[in-house]
């Protein structure tokens, strides 16, 4: 972390500020509606593009005609994650999302040996979102 703290104008080195996930989707409108269930607000930009926001998290959607969901990651030796989102209350978020009929919890809330408690959600396009919180 020391390198990140040392970056900035005084060092002559650009500092990276954040990262935004970009998901390809087959049909943007139902995908935007699905993310609204998760508490994201959406802004529709030019046709085929949207920005989703919830708190400090931002996800871009880009429509690609003929896009097909990735193969079921459950068939791979290790499940593929598309985005890893850290929250301050993973249990409350899990309860919130579990109560939604249109949301598929693809991995139940569970502690991990690397010090995080996590659960996964699969979106309409096969993208796996992991929600996590450090264990205390």
What are these regions (language model features)?
Residues 2-20, 38-86, 94-122, 133-136:
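Vicinal oxygen chelate
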Residues 22-24:
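A conserved hydrophobic helix/loop-capping motif in glycosyltransferases and polysaccharide synthases
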Residues 27-42:
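Amphipathic alpha-helical segments
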Residues 30, 91-94:
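Short, conserved charged micro-motifs
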Residues 124-129:
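Short, glycine-anchored, charge-dense loop/turn motifs used at functional sites
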């Amino acid at each position: 972390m020391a390198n990140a703290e040392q970056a900035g104008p005084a060092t002559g080195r650009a500092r990276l500020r954040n990262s935004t996930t970009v998901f390809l989707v087959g049909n943007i409108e139902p995908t935007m509606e699905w993310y609204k269930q998760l508490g994201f607000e959406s802004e529709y930009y030019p046709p085929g593009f949207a920005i989703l926001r919830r708190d400090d998290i931002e996800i871009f959607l880009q429509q690609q005609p003929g896009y097909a969901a990735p193969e079921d990651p459950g068939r791979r030796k290790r499940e593929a994650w598309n985005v890893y989102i850290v929250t301050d209350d993973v249990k409350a978020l899990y309860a919130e999302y579990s109560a939604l009929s249109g949301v598929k919890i693809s991995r139940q809330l569970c502690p991990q040996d690397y010090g995080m408690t996590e659960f996964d959600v699969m979106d309409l396009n096969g993208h796996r979102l992991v929600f996590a919180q450090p264990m205390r």
